[in-house]
């Protein structure tokens, strides 16, 4: 059933990041037409129509990287350094996974209330999959592989679990694969997972150069990770699993891959990602990055490399909120560039670029895009010039949310 909604401000979230006044959208499951609200109501007088005063209409957000499995965490993990955090995850992570269904349900609710319609969910145990299927969210679930030594048995078990996930696919849930990180996945195992992604035409995700410790290890087999392998894995004289960052990047040639974090990636490494990986996308999680490494992604460097950036929350293992609105505000405070310019980067990072990263037909208000739309109400109208920044600063909870044309809030 087609209907029309309009608002005093409409963010198209297209390449130009256009802001339109008093515009509207005709939609059913997909967007049919965009235009001046009054003109649309005259053209389609038979359709239900609603206009939202002092409101912003925009695409539903895409949170392209989160870990629902850690939604139970409050203060079980150590912050202030990547090494301290990783050690605490290995020591305490098992307890966090226990009885986490309620916390995951709350996390899904937080996504929806903050205007998120699609998520990229990293999963080791598939605990969240049924809850995602029952929710209105569109989900790309990345089954994640970890293993620092070769094990055919482990690989076969992983392939069987991926088949289980593939069997659960439907219109709004897609299966994908993740190679955890350069310090945690042996090369032959990583190549097998990447080949599985190619064979199944699945997206890939990987954490990449999130810390100085990881960079030192990958490039020189030195630093904190020497003790890490001895202490946690009981392996001495362990060397980096790769011959540098480029060796890791090159495995992902001819794939669609999300590279997550990347704060310690050089311009050369980013350019190599751009040139070697068929469809490469960068994901930044500013709150997590501040808690763990203290370093933000270099946006000038990513721009020079020609790579788009999506903004995501990561999980509650390294965040205090799964609201993407909170994350976008953290993004604004993390980067030193003119605020109006940065606000546009943030908005597109949570919409257009996130949709492209997850290969979804949404993230923009454009004809034939899926009608994933949100409306946020405010007490006053923003000026057109300040609208995106003021929206990001003041938005707290969505007023209404349409996913696939159906109102879910």
Curated annotation (Swiss-Prot):
Q: What class of enzyme is it?
A: hydrolase
User: Which keywords describe this protein according to UniProt?
Assistant: Hydrolase, Metal-binding, Zinc
Q: How does activity depend on temperature?
A: Optimum temperature is about 45 degrees Celsius.
Which residues does Zn(2+) bind?
A: 65, 67, 207, 314
**The keyword Metal-binding belongs to this UniProt entry's keyword annotation:** yes
Cited Pfam families: Amidohydro_1
EC number annotated for this UniProt entry: 3.5.4.4
**Cofactor: how and how many bound:** Binds 1 zinc ion per subunit.
Cofactors named for this entry: Zn(2+)
Please convey what the UniProt record notes about how activity depends on pH: Optimum pH is about 7.5. Retains > 70% maximum activity at pH 9.0, but displays only 6% activity at pH 4.5.
For the keyword Hydrolase, the answer is yes
Annotated InterPro entries: Amidohydro-rel (IPR006680), Metal-dep_hydrolase_composite (IPR011059), Metal_Hydrolase (IPR032466), MTA/SAH_deaminase (IPR050287)
State the Gene Ontology terms under molecular function. adenosine deaminase activity; metal ion binding
Q: Which reaction does it catalyse?
A: adenosine + H2O + H(+) = inosine + NH4(+)
Q: What family is it from?
A: Belongs to the metallo-dependent hydrolases superfamily.
Summary of the function given for this chain in its UniProt record: Catalyzes the deamination of adenosine into inosine. Is also able to deaminate adenine, but with considerably less efficiency. Is not active toward 6-chloroadenine.
Protein name, please? Answer: Adenosine deaminase
Which organism does this sequence originate in?
Answer: Helicobacter pylori (strain ATCC 700392 / 26695)
């Amino acid at each position: 059933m087609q209907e029309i909604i309009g608002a005093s401000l409409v963010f198209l979230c297209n390449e130009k990041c256009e802001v339109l006044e008093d515009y509207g959208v005709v939609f059913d499951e997909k967007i049919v037409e965009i235009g001046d609200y009054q003109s649309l109501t005259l053209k389609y007088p038979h359709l239900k129509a609603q206009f939202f005063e002092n409101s912003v209409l925009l695409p539903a957000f895409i949170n392209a990287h989160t870990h629902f499995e850690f939604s139970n965490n409050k203060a079980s993990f150590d912050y202030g350094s990547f090494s301290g955090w990783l050690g605490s995850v290995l020591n305490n992570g098992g307890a966090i996974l226990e009885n986490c269904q309620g916390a995951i349900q709350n996390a899904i609710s937080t996504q929806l209330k903050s205007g998120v319609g699609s998520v990229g969910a990293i999963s080791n145990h598939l605990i969240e999959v049924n809850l995602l299927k029952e929710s209105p969210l569109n989900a790309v679930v990345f089954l994640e592989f970890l293993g620092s030594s070769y094990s055919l048995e482990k690989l076969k078990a992983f392939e069987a679990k991926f088949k289980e996930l593939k069997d659960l696919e439907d219109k709004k849930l897609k299966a994908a694969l993740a190679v955890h990180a350069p310090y945690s996945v042996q090369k032959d195992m990583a190549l097998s997972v990447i080949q599985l992604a190619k064979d199944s035409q699945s997206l890939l995700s990987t954490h990449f150069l999130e810390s100085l410790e990881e960079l030192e290890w990958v490039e020189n087999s030195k630093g904190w990770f020497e003790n890490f392998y001895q202490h946690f894995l009981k392996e001495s004289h362990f060397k980096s699993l790769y011959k540098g960052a480029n060796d890791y990047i090159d495995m992902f040639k001819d794939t669609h891959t999300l590279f997550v974090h990347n704060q310690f990636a050089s311009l050369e490494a980013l350019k190599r990602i751009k040139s070697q990986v068929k469809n490469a996308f960068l994901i930044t999680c500013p709150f997590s990055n501040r808690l763990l490494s203290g370093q933000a992604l270099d946006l000038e460097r990513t721009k020079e490399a020609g790579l788009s950036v999506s903004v995501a929350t990561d999980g509650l293992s390294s965040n205090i909120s799964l609201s993407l609105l909170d994350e976008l505000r953290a993004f604004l405070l993390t980067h030193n560039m003119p605020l109006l310019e940065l606000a546009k980067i943030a908005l597109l990072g949570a919409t257009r670029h996130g949709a492209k990263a997850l290969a979804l037909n949404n993230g923009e208000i454009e004809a034939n895009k899926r009608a994933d739309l949100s409306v946020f109400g405010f007490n006053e109208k923003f000026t057109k010039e300040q609208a995106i920044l003021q929206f990001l600063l003041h938005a707290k909870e969505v007023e209404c949310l349409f996913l696939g044309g159906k109102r879910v809030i």
